[in-house]
């Protein structure tokens, strides 16, 4: 086995090493370079033309091919080198390089190749390559390779360069490997080209067509010239000519200065958003993120820039047109700012250096030819708010710079640009100073040394303060105070915190500048006692100038040095169309920016004349909107004179194409059904016929709706396309407008009147009445209204402004329709209602037709002839009806005659056929004489008289004829003999057959003879036949009845079978439960001892159905019999949980610890010794008595602050506000006394054992005995309550053991009554409600308020489990008794009601004491009970749990099941909630009563009647708390007396828990949304839906006002599910609240699973006790020897405390100077923060100092400090990236 294990581990190691090595190889520089170089092969440039031309045409000349290839490779090598070498990169990537070099070279090469016959129509086939020498070929390939790629340009690859160059240190290796990768790809490409050429040469079709080959060879030079010409045009499009560009007007200096005065000061240094304060600026300015330079060559190419001048006096001034100044506001004034004292000499040296520059002419020449300030590149115009002119878009978000951090030189990607600029200026001016550079080791050691010194100083200071505290000094004298800025020492009038410069953190704020005299008087001179002093003050203001803005900046800033930085900026001020329209003054300047194509749509015109001044013309007020074009805008925000950006990613193939997109998004567009692979649609199409008819109709309806939507969308797109097409074509709007006007005139004056005339003339010809008046009256109703291009109507006579250029629409109101006949005016109302509303307007089209929408498809109007055709159809129908009878009679007569004639013809044909047949037979046979026939018959008749009739019947009729022809006597004898023989033979055969049949039918012949003899009498056979007939008739009738009733019969049988099966299943538990109870009783009797306490497990809900018959309660101890057939499964699980089995393994983990045995009592030692758990030797050893240490208790069990709060309240605390309050209380307190030992606050520790699944329950049952034993000795010295702080140094008297399955008490909704924390809870406190967190909250998702009336709703929020049990000294055994009481309404109770049975309940009619057992409030009166028949359920008791399950689906801690409340409802309806104490009974008394109980129903617990209610020994101790809780609950209930129970219940929850939201149904929303909109319009509010919900929630908006019935209330709306209560799906605030909560959760990790035994260590806590003496005054009723402990590090200030923690956590000596990258460092070598806790498990046993140090180190790992370290060290402030598990010891 060991060999196999070793082999498996070896294989795993080899595999892991292979995987890691493969990952390293893949991420290496060489592999990435090869990958990048291989993909650059697909980027094809113009040099490939020369390469392919040489391969195709110059097959024989190897030198020229090699020269082309070498030049091609050399050019690509230069491109790769330019990646690494910056000067070459700048030379090749200058903006004018391609314009100055590439275009002339391409044009020269193009014309030079074709100079001989460029204008000829026929090109020569001579090889132009032979005219060039090898050098020219090499240069062509080299130079063309440097040009930009135009096929598959490598923009993505260029971005990859920047990524990998920043990632890897060995850049040259990356360049070399990328070149090798490109070379490999190039070789593959050339091989592929050779294979293609070889295939072309070997192809028989091409070789056979010699003419095609010759033409191809002759035209190769022409093809090459054309391609080269296309490349030239392509580059000309990319880079326009620098000389022919549109010049723009520059802004004047006066405008610049005037506008600069209006600009506000720019604060460049960013303010920290977390603290919200302005930190001190260090004389440097941080530029806007958009001002960071992306390309450093921009500093050299731009001469006209703006200079940001950071002066130290705090104001901004304008130097000239291109220079601006920025100042840091809070920096002190420094007049003599000279770093090296030789600034003048530095300026002289700089000028001399510029004179020595040889290429001084380069900059003016480039500026002259290529003016970068012209808008000749497709750049966006980006306007900056800080500057009036636009800043070039050449900035980056990050700024990289090297800095020294942690004693090492590092690269920071968020370095302040202002600091780097300032540092560069200092380095330039410090020419004389020579600084020595230290090595990395030396600088790092120096940094470590300084940090060690800081740590030692802080540690010594802390130890000194602790030593002073131990000597007995007060805490106020030892604590480090904050330094404040005060006026006088005695008065101690300090500045406000917001203005105090010595404070930091949240106290700091911005100081507002004072400008007016009133504000200066208010701040500088807050109170003036003598009013005469104000006069002198005013005089002082008049003498001295106070308006500092008017002072000239030159006088102030003469001796102030400036920090300047060049900023890319344009010298033009450009505006677009919108800005031009917004300008109040008319500007003569042209718009410089091309705006998006739009139109001004006038919505409203108001023509009003001014009555006051008649000379003024009409004032036209227009309300207009801007309508943008639907087509793609390729010139938006582009400066006039610049070229369009080439959109390589979008494809347009239509004149007008909506939603232009890239081919990458083809999957988003609508697909064709044939080409798409939509599985749902295909399956729907295939299996459509297999569906049910109803679903088929639904599918058809949905498909029809989809088809309609699709058609509507298609028509809308077509309409927009037509509109945009008209708007795109030049002069199209003018032509269209004129055509529309002409069509309107023709329609109104010519077309329609001519139609009316023609119609009436036709009526006259047909002798019908004419309708001249009606037609012309309808024609006059038609109105043609002029509209804008978008269909906004203006008036009938007014044309829209600029309608010839913008377009026009003509709207026809009440359009005329020519009718053949006008109907009468008096029409019935029903016919008018059936018609419905008809659209009374249309838009005129270009073709004179009508459309419903502008540019819509023309409609099909009612036709004139259609009505005539309908009338003709009606007349035709009338004629048909009249002639229908005659036609019917004629048809019937013709049918009858046809039938008769057919019958006659058939009869005649039959007769004819019969005669013909007879004739044929006569001709065939010879006739026989009558004599012969007679003779034969006589001879035959003599044989047998009985056969007479058969012979005669069988004679042949055709032979009865007489022969006419002559007889041949010679042959006649032979034929006659033969005939006679045949006749004899036939007769014999017939006779035999007749005999056989005669024998068979003899019986029937006799019956017939009898009948003939007795015809009046019926025989027996006839009677039997009649009886059988009657029987079968009866059978048929019964069969019909059975067929009718079989369906009901089958149903009856099935129900009978199902009922039998269900009854048998239900009776299974009743047959088996007795066995379980007997076994349980045996086990309990076996393990019960008089000196041992029995367990008190948690009872599951066990509701048993009451027997149907009534039980009479004659005495107090009468029993209620129960029917065990309705036993719940939960009760079975409960009884199984009580089975006691001694398992040593469960206690193994507890007793492995060597310090366990001294804590165990002698009785328990003896018991476990008999079980073999303990060794007998260790039982009698006496060890030193250990106790629980206060510090250790506080460290291991307590949360951060010692207050009685739940985790919900802790998560809602504001940390800073809390700490300030606590520190203030500590600092201001001066009375410290300590007389009694009692806890600071009774804190009830929480531990949530959630019963969420069956395995979890089994695990709890498995560790049941272990938890019981450990709980006994954890709380060995504790009182009745399980307060964690009740762990004294002295040993109290031993009490009985209480085990409530958990070792603590908990509250469902922890509303702390000890301290009011409402001031410390944030209002916007929210948590993520979708997750099932550890915090207990009310789940509103499935809460059904209408399901039941909750009497104990107030107590749900304050369930107290701690007082649910009581203990006495005499009791050695204790048990809880629970019952469930669900009372139905009196009018609803009957024999079928489900009443929960109290197990072994003893009812005291006079004074009844009950112990309740409640699961999330099931002891309630159920109002809305379902109508279902619950007899068919297996376990009807589970129906009672259904609603409780919906509220909290089996995720409830077990300790929440106990609810000790007794609710008594008075007749007046007032609720009185009282507590019932658990009655502890002696084991002997219980055993005595146990003998008196019947055997049946031995299921649970007893409740003993107690005559004396005050017999409980601990009742007096709990009276105070009970009264307090009862008064609070009663106070909350009394407030709601005026409301109903449900309303009071809802208000109670809404006041305390606001973490929910209301949501209404769509139907309900539609009803009231109109009313809400009216309110919103009146109140000028937004978001009507949110306002409605919040208003309803705060009762600000009454539901009676809405469009719903007045009787509708909030409860009814919830019942009808119109208003739904949902959990508030809010996001988590990643702030101090979350950090505080996470801190508390992390601290509970070691205590959440199991409690371990505690030890006593004697520690001197004299000073600590004295410092905490003041708290005993606040809490006197607590247990003794419970303390609150001061954290030693709190003696220091918060800043010093954080500094000390960081110094401790740094562990500087373990640092490595090398690389910190995770991929190259060993992660196992880093030590995590938990080494202080887990490195040695026996630290708390050895010495006191280690324990003190461990307690002292505990706060160092709080999450809030680590968050600060994460923010400032790792430069990430996003909370989502912060994880406690990923933070290790620094460095990270």
Curated annotation (Swiss-Prot):
Annotated region described as Disordered, given as residue ranges: 248-297, 1482-1526
Composition-biased stretches (Basic and acidic residues): 253-277, 1513-1526
UniProt topology in membrane: Multi-pass membrane protein
Coiled-coil region list: none
Domain of life per record: Eukaryota
Keyword Cell cycle: no
Record localization: Plastid, Chloroplast inner membrane
BP term (GO), one: protein transport
Any single Gene Ontology cellular-component annotation: chloroplast inner membrane
Keyword annotations from UniProtKB, A to Z: Chloroplast, Membrane, Plastid, Plastid inner membrane, Protein transport, Transmembrane, Transmembrane helix, Transport
TM stretches of this protein: 25-45, 70-90, 95-115, 132-152, 180-200, 223-243
Family affiliation: Belongs to the TIC214 family.
Record note on quaternary structure: Part of the Tic complex.
Entry function: Involved in protein precursor import into chloroplasts. May be part of an intermediate translocation complex acting as a protein-conducting channel at the inner envelope.
UniProt name for this protein: Protein TIC 214
Gene: TIC214
């Amino acid at each position: 086995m060991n060999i196999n294990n070793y082999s498996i581990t070896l294989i795993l190691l080899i595999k892991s090493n292979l995987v890691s090595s493969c990952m390293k190889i893949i991420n290496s520089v060489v592999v990435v370079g090869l990958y990048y170089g291989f993909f650059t092969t697909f980027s094809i440039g113009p040099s490939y033309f020369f390469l392919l031309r040489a391969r195709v045409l110059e097959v024989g000349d190897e030198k020229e091919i090699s020269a082309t290839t070498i030049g091609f490779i050399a050019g690509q090598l230069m491109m790769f080198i330019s990646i690494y070498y910056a000067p070459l990169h700048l030379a090749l990537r200058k903006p004018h390089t391609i314009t100055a070099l590439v275009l002339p070279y391409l044009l020269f090469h193009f014309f030079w190749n074709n100079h001989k016959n460029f204008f000829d129509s026929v090109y020569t086939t001579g090889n132009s390559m032979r005219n060039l020498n090898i050098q020219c070929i090499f240069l062509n390939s080299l130079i063309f390779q440097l040009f930009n790629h135009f096929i598959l340009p490598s923009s993505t690859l260029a971005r990859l360069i920047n990524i990998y160059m920043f990632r890897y240190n060995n850049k040259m290796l990356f360049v070399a490997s990328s070149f090798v990768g490109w070379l490999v790809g190039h070789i593959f490409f050339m091989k592929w080209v050779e294979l293609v050429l070889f295939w072309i040469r070997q192809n028989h079709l091409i070789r056979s067509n010699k003419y095609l080959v010759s033409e191809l060879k002759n035209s190769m030079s022409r093809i090459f010239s054309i391609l080269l010409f296309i490349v030239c045009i392509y580059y000309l499009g990319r880079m326009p000519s620098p000389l022919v560009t549109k010049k723009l007007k520059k802004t004047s200096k006066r405008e610049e200065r005037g506008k600069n005065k209006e600009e506000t000061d720019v604060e460049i240094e960013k303010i920290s958003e977390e603290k919200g304060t302005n930190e001190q600026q260090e004389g440097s300015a941080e530029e806007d993120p958009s001002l960071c330079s992306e390309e450093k060559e921009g500093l050299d190419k731009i001469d006209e820039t703006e200079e940001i001048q950071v002066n130290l006096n705090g104001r901004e001034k304008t130097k000239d047109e291109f220079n601006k100044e920025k100042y840091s506001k809070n920096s002190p004034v420094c007049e003599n700012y000279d770093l090296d004292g030789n600034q003048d000499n530095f300026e002289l040296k700089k000028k001399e250096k510029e004179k020595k520059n040889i290429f001084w002419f380069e900059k003016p020449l480039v500026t002259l030819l290529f003016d970068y300030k012209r808008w000749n590149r497709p750049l966006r115009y980006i306007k900056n708010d800080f500057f009036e002119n636009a800043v070039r878009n050449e900035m980056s978000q990050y700024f990289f710079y090297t800095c020294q951090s942690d004693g090492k030189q590092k690269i920071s990607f968020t370095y302040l640009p202002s600091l780097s600029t300032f540092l560069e200026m200092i380095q330039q001016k410090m020419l004389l100073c020579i600084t020595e550079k230290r090595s990395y080791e030396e600088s790092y050691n120096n940094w470590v040394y300084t940090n060690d010194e800081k740590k030692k100083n802080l540690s010594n200071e802390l130890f000194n303060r602790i030593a002073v505290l131990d000597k007995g000094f007060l805490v106020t004298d030892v604590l480090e105070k904050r330094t404040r800025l005060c006026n006088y020492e005695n008065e101690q009038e300090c500045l406000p915190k917001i203005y105090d410069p010595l404070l930091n953190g949240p106290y700091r704020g911005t100081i507002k500048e004072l400008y007016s005299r009133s504000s200066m008087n208010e701040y500088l001179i807050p109170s003036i006692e003598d009013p005469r002093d104000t006069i002198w003050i005013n005089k002082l203001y008049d003498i001295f100038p106070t308006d500092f803005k008017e002072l000239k900046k030159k006088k102030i800033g003469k001796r102030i040095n400036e920090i300047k930085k060049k900023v890319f900026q344009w010298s033009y001020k450009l505006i677009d169309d919108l800005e031009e329209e917004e300008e109040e003054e008319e500007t003569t300047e042209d718009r410089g920016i091309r705006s998006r194509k739009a139109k001004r749509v006038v919505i409203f015109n108001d023509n009003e004349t001014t009555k006051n001044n008649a000379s003024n013309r009409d004032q036209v007020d227009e309300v207009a909107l801007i309508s943008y074009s639907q087509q793609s805008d390729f010139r938006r925000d582009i400066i006039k004179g610049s070229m369009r950006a080439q959109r390589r990613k979008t494809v347009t193939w239509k004149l007008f194409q909506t939603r232009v997109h890239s081919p990458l998004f083809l999957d988003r567009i609508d697909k064709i059904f044939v080409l798409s692979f939509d599985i749902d649609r295909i399956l729907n199409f295939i299996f459509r016929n297999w569906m049910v008819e109803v679903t088929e109709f639904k599918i058809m309806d949905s498909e029809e709706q989809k088809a309609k939507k699709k058609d509507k969308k298609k028509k809308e797109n077509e309409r927009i396309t037509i509109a945009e097409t008209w708007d795109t074509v030049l002069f199209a709007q003018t032509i269209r407008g004129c055509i529309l006007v002409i069509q309107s005139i023709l329609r109104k004056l010519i077309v329609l009147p001519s139609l009316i005339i023609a119609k009436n003339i036709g009526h006259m010809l047909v002798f019908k009445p004419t309708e001249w008046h009606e037609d012309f009256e309808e024609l006059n109703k038609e109105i043609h209204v002029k509209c804008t291009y978008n269909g906004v109507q203006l008036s009938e006579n007014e044309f829209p402004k600029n309608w010839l250029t913008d377009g026009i629409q003509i709207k026809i109101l009440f359009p005329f329709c020519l009718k053949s006949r006008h109907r009468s005016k008096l029409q019935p109302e029903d016919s008018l209602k059936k018609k419905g509303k008809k659209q009374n307007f249309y838009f005129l089209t270009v073709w004179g037709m009508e459309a419903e929408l502008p540019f819509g498809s023309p409609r099909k109007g009612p036709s004139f002839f259609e009505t005539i055709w309908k009338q003709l159809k009606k007349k035709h129908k009338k004629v048909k009806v009249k002639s229908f009878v005659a036609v019917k009679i004629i048809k019937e007569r013709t049918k009858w005659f046809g039938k008769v004639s057919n019958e006659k013809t058939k009869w005649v044909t039959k007769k004819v056929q019969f005669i013909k047949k007879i004739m044929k037979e006569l001709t065939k046979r010879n006739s026989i004489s009558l004599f012969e026939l007679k003779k034969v018959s006589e001879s035959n008749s003599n044989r047998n008289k009985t056969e007479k009739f058969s012979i005669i019947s069988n004679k042949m009729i055709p032979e009865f004829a007489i022969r006419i022809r002559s007889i041949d006597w010679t042959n006649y004898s032979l034929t006659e003999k033969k005939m006679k023989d045949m006749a004899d033979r036939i007769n014999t055969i017939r006779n035999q057959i007749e005999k056989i049949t005669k024998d068979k039918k003899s019986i029937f012949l006799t019956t017939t003879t009898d009948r003939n003899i007795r015809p009046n009498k019926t025989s027996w056979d006839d009677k039997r036949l009649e009886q059988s007939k009657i029987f079968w008739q009866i059978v048929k009738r019964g069969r019909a009845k059975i067929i009718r009733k079989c369906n009901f019969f089958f149903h009856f049988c099935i129900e009978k079978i199902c009922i039998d099966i269900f009854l048998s299943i239900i009776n299974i538990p009743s047959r088996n439960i007795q066995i379980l109870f007997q076994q349980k009783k045996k086990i309990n009797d076996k393990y019960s001892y008089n000196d041992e306490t029995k367990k008190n497990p948690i009872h599951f809900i066990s509701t048993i159905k009451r027997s149907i018959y009534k039980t009479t309660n004659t005495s107090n101890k009468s029993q209620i019999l129960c029917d065990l057939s309705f036993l719940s499964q939960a009760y079975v699980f409960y009884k199984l949980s009580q089975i006691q089995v001694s398992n040593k393994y469960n206690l193994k983990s507890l007793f492995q610890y060597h310090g366990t045995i001294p804590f165990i009592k002698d009785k328990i030692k003896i018991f476990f010794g008999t079980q073999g758990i303990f060794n007998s030797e260790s039982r009698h050893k006496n060890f030193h008595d250990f106790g629980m240490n206060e510090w250790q208790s506080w460290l291991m069990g307590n949360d951060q602050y010692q207050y009685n709060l739940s985790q919900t309240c802790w998560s809602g605390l504001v940390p800073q506000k809390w700490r300030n309050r606590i520190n203030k209380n500590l600092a201001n307190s001066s009375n410290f006394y300590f007389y009694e030992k009692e806890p600071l606050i009774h804190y009830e520790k929480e531990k949530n054992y959630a019963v969420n699944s069956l395995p979890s329950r089994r695990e709890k049952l498995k560790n049941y005995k272990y938890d019981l034993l450990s709980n006994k000795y954890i709380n060995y010295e504790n009182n009745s309550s399980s307060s964690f702080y009740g762990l004294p140094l002295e040993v109290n008297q031993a009490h009985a053991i209480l085990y409530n399955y958990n070792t603590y008490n908990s509250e469902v909704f922890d509303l702390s009554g000890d301290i009011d924390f409402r001031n410390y809870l944030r209002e916007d406190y929210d948590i993520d409600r979708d997750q099932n967190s550890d915090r207990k909250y009310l789940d509103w998702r499935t809460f059904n308020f209408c399901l039941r009336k909750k009497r104990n709703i107030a107590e749900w929020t304050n369930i107290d489990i701690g007082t649910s049990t009581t203990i006495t000294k005499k009791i050695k055994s204790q048990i809880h008794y629970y019952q469930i009481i669900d009372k139905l309404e009196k009018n609803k109770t009957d024999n079928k009601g489900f009443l929960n049975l109290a197990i072994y309940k003893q009812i005291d009619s006079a004074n009844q004491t009950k112990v309740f057992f409640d699961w999330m409030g099931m002891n309630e009166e159920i109002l809305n009970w379902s109508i279902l028949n619950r007899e068919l359920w297996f376990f009807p008791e589970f129906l009672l749990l259904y609603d409780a399950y919906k509220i909290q689906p089996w995720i409830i801690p077990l300790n929440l099941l106990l609810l000790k409340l007794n609710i008594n409802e008075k007749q007046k309806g007032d609720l009185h909630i009282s507590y019932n104490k658990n009655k502890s009974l002696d084991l002997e008394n219980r055993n005595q009563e146990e003998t008196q109980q019947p055997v049946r129903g031995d299921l649970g617990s007893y409740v003993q009647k107690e005559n004396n209610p005050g017999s409980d020994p601990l009742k007096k101790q709990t009276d105070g708390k009970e009264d307090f809780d009862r008064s609070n609950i009663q106070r909350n209930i009394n407030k709601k007396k005026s409301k109903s129970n449900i309303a009071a219940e809802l208000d109670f929850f809404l006041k305390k828990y606001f973490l929910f939201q209301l949501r209404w149904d769509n139907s309900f929303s539609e009803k009231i949304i109109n009313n809400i909109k009216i309110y919103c319009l009146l109140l000028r509010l937004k978001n009507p839906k949110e306002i409605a919900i919040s208003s309803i929630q705060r009762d600000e908006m009454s539901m009676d006002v809405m469009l719903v019935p007045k009787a509708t209330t909030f409860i009814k709306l919830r019942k009808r599910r119109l208003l739904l209560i949902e959990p508030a799906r809010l996001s988590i605030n990643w702030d101090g609240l979350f950090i505080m909560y996470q801190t508390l959760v992390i601290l509970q990790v070691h205590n959440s699973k199991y409690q371990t035994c505690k030890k006593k260590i004697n520690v001197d806590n004299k000073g600590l006790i004295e410092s905490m003496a003041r708290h005993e005054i606040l809490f006197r009723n607590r247990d003794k020897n419970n303390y609150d402990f001061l954290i030693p590090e709190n003696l220091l200030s918060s800043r010093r405390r954080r500094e000390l923690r960081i110094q401790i956590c740094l562990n500087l000596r373990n640092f490595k100077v090398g690389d910190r990258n995770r991929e190259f460092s060993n992660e196992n070598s880093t030590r995590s923060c938990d080494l202080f806790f887990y490195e040695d498990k026996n630290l708390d046993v050895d010495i006191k100092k280690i324990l003190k140090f461990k307690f002292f180190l505990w706060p160092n790992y709080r999450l809030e400090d680590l968050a600060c370290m994460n923010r400032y060290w790792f430069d990430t402030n996003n909370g989502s990236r912060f994880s406690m598990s990923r933070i290790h010891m620094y460095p990270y």
